[in-house]
């Protein structure tokens, strides 16, 4: 028999732990507990001195306000059916102001449950009667306007930056309440996902009522998401509940490789936990490990910090990996300081030429005799710092142990699985845990706990990072100095760390919410001045710490990279992305491990693009340097043969022997020789950059049509610079950063404050977040964006089970240079597309170190792509076809048509025979594309060939004949290939005078 969920609250002050865990719908708890204890909690006392809280009815003031209770949460699991139940629960406890202020409680009650609603309504009216406005619990951070209205209410128990109560009008209770953003504010495709991915109530889950078992089973059979063609979509559901199947595929393909590789196991909560009901915080150590993990989850006070810890645990690959990394970091610090101190004060270098043992050059009692005064003081400071790091490690071990128990017992994920498990699976397990009605003890986080999905979790984890992405892309920071060589904005890791400390530490409070003073226009001048003072103070501290930081990082970089450059001199030309490039490339709500994998995969293509451009001037200079250095090394080595024992110690200059110069000159020769480019590359920068865009997501509109030009390459190299240059900038930045903080950044303080005020958006349950991270399409102005309907947007971003977004779709989101607002909106649209691709496409569900399984092309002869490196001998060997080496990405083998417009892999033999026999190229193209049957089981692909720089200003328009004339020297201009074939081409080639040079 089902118990009544709505009972009158009583005054028994029990610790209702079960209400935080299992909510209103639990059927497996101890029957001795009253169900009202599981659905209510005491409202904190509000100061009765306010006129808002006085009632005109004297009899109601005699009742103890501690008995006044409001619902802790609407125990919905994000389904449409349960949202209706949520509405009934909210209305059951919502104050009916229209009737309460007049004392009229006549409701059209026809059931006993409605009578309970009337009684609860009258109880809550004691709090608000006598006022024209009412207060209801509000989840998350209060908006700045609402806080100004309620400033006269003194809530000592709550943080000023995270108020609990909000004013609301009566019509807000007549409409349906939701835990998420209103559907009208959701992006179009988000609404499509949320409407179609409404999860079904899982009838097998623990502690849930079974009154809708048959209804849910019937509905779940016909409620799978479908794509625009009407077929069931093969994708993942990370928006809503997790109690439904993780993938929904077609009936022909019910099995999925991801469900086999990463089987999901629902959290196995305790079936009898009545012992936890009266357990206070100071006695949780008496509980078992699993019970303690459940208690911790139920008493989460700050969901932002908790989810960030959960993600950092996943990012660190578990308990032992994180602890090992922290210990090794301390050991690295100790090693650098100990070795540098010992080598500087405990070795007598004057005895090196005459000594043969280490003991002969060691200074006895060097720490007491040689190290004195200033150096010893800083050594003691360093020892104290190491002790603090060890103490911090002790507390980190306790915290990580709790996270390990949370993963192991509540999410059913072991540490061994974290290295291969996709983050999407962790999100899915969190949603399972949420759907089992686990609540928080903090009323501010009640509804926030029910807002756990991929989008909201990413917003909580990246609340600060999203602001930083928008900040660095807006170019409002002045990072230059009014002196030569430093007039350009250069961001380094040192400067980035200081900006994060000064700006983000000032804007956000300890709870992780943005401060209300930042959002109030009336306090703009005050916040601007405070931020300026913060910049100047940070600059002063950097000046004091600069000598020690420079010394430490010089030694660290020397120990880390010297052996690499010594053994592999060619690595000195290695490149990496600059810090500003990483912030420009990163998308909103893109977690770090996804971004890191994407950027790491792009380095090969980035090197390919840079290496395509000739470096003749550099090569000539390096050849000369290598010749000079090699000559001196050869002379010294030759002279060493006559007297190897004495000549090696012969001093060429003061205190510089032959060995010294052989070592230095040999290193210079090796570096210069390995840097000279001696290989041939296909010059196709346009195709390479467009392919690189698939990983960097960065292709400015200004570059269009100029991909082959040197200035575009130089602009790209500013983002993808030499590693040695970046290291030198980092060392220089340690001395330049104090002046940037003191002179340059204070002038940007006003724009920074305006940026946070103008780009913050309030979301119920989340607080203030960066507006671009919410993917709200209504914020976009312009006719082009408003004209996008749901179908067109879905076509751009919808993905099925085996195909990801291709370059033609993604290139539509390239930033346009109409205005800064257009750039920001385009960045938001682009982030939205890739966010949906990361979480909706099953092909992207991989671990941190794994690549998605792409369907490759047939491994037949002639189907491989064009090689970047080839020799003339290979190109012109007998029987070789010169079309294989044409300009472009795709090789022309038997499976490709040589038409420069469109070619297909369908019917490859006929295409190649027609073209090789001299048939009309256009006819060959038509034959290749005539049978375009989507139901063909073969892997047929159709490509649009793009030319490198042929579409630029130098070559405005080229038709098919022009392309064939350019790419085939035997083309006669009539669409026919000459019968001279390869021999004729070789004959023409060897007529040139420069052959063999």
Swiss-Prot record:
Write out the topological domains of type Lumenal: 340-376, 642-656
Q: Transmembrane region positions?
A: 319-339, 377-397, 621-641, 657-677
Query: What's the impact of mutating residue 113 to R?
Result: Abolished ubiquitination by the SCF(MET30) complex and subsequent degradation
Q: Where is this region: Disordered?
A: 29-88, 128-159, 213-235
Q: Which residues lie on this side of the membrane: Cytoplasmic?
A: 1-318, 398-538, 560-620, 678-723, 745-997
**How is this protein annotated for GO cellular component?**
autophagosome; cytoplasmic vesicle membrane; endoplasmic reticulum membrane; Golgi membrane; mitochondrial membrane; mitochondrion; phagophore; phagophore assembly site
Annotated phenotype, changing residue 122 to A = Impaired selective autophagy. Does not affect ubiquitination by the SCF(MET30) complex
Q: Where is the composition biased (Polar residues)?
A: 29-39, 221-233
Give GO BP annotations, semicolon-separated.
autophagosome assembly; autophagy; cytoplasm to vacuole targeting by the Cvt pathway; mitophagy; nucleophagy; phospholipid translocation; piecemeal microautophagy of the nucleus; protein localization to phagophore assembly site
Which family is annotated?
A: Belongs to the ATG9 family.
What is the name attached to this protein's record?
Autophagy-related protein 9
Show the taxonomic lineage. Eukaryota, Fungi, Dikarya, Ascomycota, Saccharomycotina
């Amino acid at each position: 028999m089902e118990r009544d969920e709505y009972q009158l609250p009583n005054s028994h002050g029990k610790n209702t732990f079960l209400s935080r865990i299992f909510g209103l719908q639990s059927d497996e708890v101890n029957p001795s507990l009253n169900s009202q204890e599981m659905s209510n909690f005491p409202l904190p006392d509000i100061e009765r001195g306010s006129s808002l809280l006085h009632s005109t009815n004297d009899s109601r003031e005699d009742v103890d306000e501690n008995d006044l209770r409001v619902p802790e949460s609407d125990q919905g699991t994000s389904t449409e059916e349960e949202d209706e139940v949520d509405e009934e629960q909210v209305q059951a406890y919502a104050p009916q102001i229209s009737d309460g202020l007049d004392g009229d409680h006549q409701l059209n009650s026809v059931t006993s449950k409605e009578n309970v609603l009337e009684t609860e309504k009258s109880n809550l009216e004691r709090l608000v009667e006598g006022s024209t406005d009412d207060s209801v619990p509000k989840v998350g951070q209060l908006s700045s306007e609402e806080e100004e209205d309620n400033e006269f209410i003194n809530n000592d128990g709550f943080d000023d930056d995270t108020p609990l109560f909000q004013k609301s009008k009566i019509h807000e209770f007549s409409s349906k309440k939701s835990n998420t953003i209103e559907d009208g504010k959701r992006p179009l495709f988000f609404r499509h996902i949320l409407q179609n991915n409404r999860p079904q109530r899982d009838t097998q889950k623990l502690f849930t009522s079974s009154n809708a078992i048959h209804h849910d089973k019937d509905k779940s059979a016909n409620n799978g998401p479908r794509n625009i063609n009407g077929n069931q979509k093969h994708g993942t559901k990370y928006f809503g509940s997790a109690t439904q199947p993780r993938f929904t595929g077609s009936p022909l393909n019910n099995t999925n490789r991801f469900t086999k590789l990463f089987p999901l196991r629902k959290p196995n909560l305790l079936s009898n936990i009545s012992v936890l009901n009266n357990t206070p915080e100071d006695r949780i150590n008496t509980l078992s490990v699993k019970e303690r993990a459940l208690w911790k989850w139920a008493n989460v006070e700050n969901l932002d910090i908790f989810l960030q810890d959960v993600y950092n645990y996943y990012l660190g690959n578990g308990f032992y990996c994180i602890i090992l990394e922290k210990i090794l970091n301390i050991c690295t610090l100790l090693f650098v300081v100990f070795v540098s101190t010992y080598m500087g004060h405990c070795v007598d270098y004057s005895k090196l030429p005459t000594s043969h043992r280490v003991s002969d050059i060691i200074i006895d009692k060097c720490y007491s005799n040689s190290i004195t005064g200033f150096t010893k003081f800083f050594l003691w400071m360093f020892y104290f710092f190491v002790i603090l790091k060890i103490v911090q490690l002790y507390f980190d071990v306790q915290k990580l142990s709790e996270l390990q128990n949370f993963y192991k017992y509540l999410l059913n994920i072991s540490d061994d699985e974290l290295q291969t498990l996709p983050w999407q699976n962790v999100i899915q397990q969190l949603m399972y845990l949420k759907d089992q009605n686990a609540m928080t003890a903090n009323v501010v986080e009640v509804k926030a706990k029910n807002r756990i999905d991929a989008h909201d979790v990413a917003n909580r984890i990246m609340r600060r990072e999203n602001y930083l992405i928008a900040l660095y892309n807006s170019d409002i920071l002045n990072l230059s100095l009014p002196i030569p060589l430093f007039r350009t904005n250069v961001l380094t890791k040192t400067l980035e760390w200081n900006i994060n400390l000064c700006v983000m530490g000032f804007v956000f409070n300890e709870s992780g919410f943005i401060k209300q003073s930042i959002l109030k226009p009336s306090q703009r001048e005050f916040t601007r001045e405070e931020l300026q003072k913060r910049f100047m103070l940070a600059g002063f501290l950097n000046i004091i710490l600069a000598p020690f930081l420079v010394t430490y990082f010089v030694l660290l970089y020397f120990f880390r990279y010297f052996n690499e450059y010594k053994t592999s001199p060619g690595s000195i030309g290695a490149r990496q992305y600059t810090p500003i490039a990483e912030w420009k490339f990163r998308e909103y709500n893109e977690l770090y491990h996804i971004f890191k994998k994407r950027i790491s995969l792009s380095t090969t293509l980035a090197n390919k693009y840079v290496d395509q451009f000739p470096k003749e001037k550099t090569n000539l200079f390096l050849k000369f340097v290598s010749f000079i250095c090699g000559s001196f090394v050869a002379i010294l080595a030759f002279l060493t043969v006559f007297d190897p024992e004495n000549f090696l110690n012969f001093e060429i200059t003061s205190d510089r022997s032959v060995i010294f110069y052989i070592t230095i000159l040999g290193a210079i020769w090796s570096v210069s020789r390995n840097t000279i480019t001696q290989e041939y590359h296909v010059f196709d920068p346009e195709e390479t950059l467009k392919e690189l865009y698939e990983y960097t997501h960065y292709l400015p509109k200004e570059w269009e049509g100029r991909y082959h030009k040197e200035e575009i390459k130089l602009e790209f190299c500013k983002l993808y610079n030499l590693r040695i240059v970046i290291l030198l900038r980092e060392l220089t930045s340690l001395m330049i950063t104090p002046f940037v903080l003191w002179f340059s950044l204070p002038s940007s303080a006003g724009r920074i404050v305006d940026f946070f005020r103008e780009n913050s958006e309030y979301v119920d349950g989340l607080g203030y977040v960066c507006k671009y991270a919410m993917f709200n399409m209504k914020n976009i102005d312009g006719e082009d964006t408003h004209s996008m309907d749901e179908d067109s947007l879905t076509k751009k971003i919808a993905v099925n089970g085996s195909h990801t977004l291709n370059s033609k779709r993604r290139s539509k989101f390239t930033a346009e240079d109409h205005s800064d607002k257009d750039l920001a909106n385009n960045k938001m649209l682009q982030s939205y597309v890739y966010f949906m691709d990361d979480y909706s496409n099953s092909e992207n569900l991989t671990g941190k170190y794994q690549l998605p399984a792409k369907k490759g092309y047939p491994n037949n002869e002639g189907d491989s792509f064009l090689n970047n490196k080839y020799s003339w001998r290979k190109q012109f060997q007998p029987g070789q076809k010169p079309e294989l080496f044409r300009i472009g990405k795709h090789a022309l083998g038997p499976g490709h048509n040589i038409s420069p417009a469109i070619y297909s892999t369908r019917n490859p033999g006929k295409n190649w025979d027609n073209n090789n026999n001299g048939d009309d190229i256009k006819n060959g193209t038509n034959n290749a594309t005539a049978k375009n049957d989507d139901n063909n089981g073969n892997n047929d692909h159709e490509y649009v060939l793009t030319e490198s720089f042929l579409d630029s200003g130098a070559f405005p328009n080229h038709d098919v004949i022009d392309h064939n004339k350019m790419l085939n020297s035997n083309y006669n201009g009539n669409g026919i290939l000459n019968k001279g074939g390869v021999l004729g081409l070789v004959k023409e080639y060897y007529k040139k005078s420069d052959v063999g040079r």
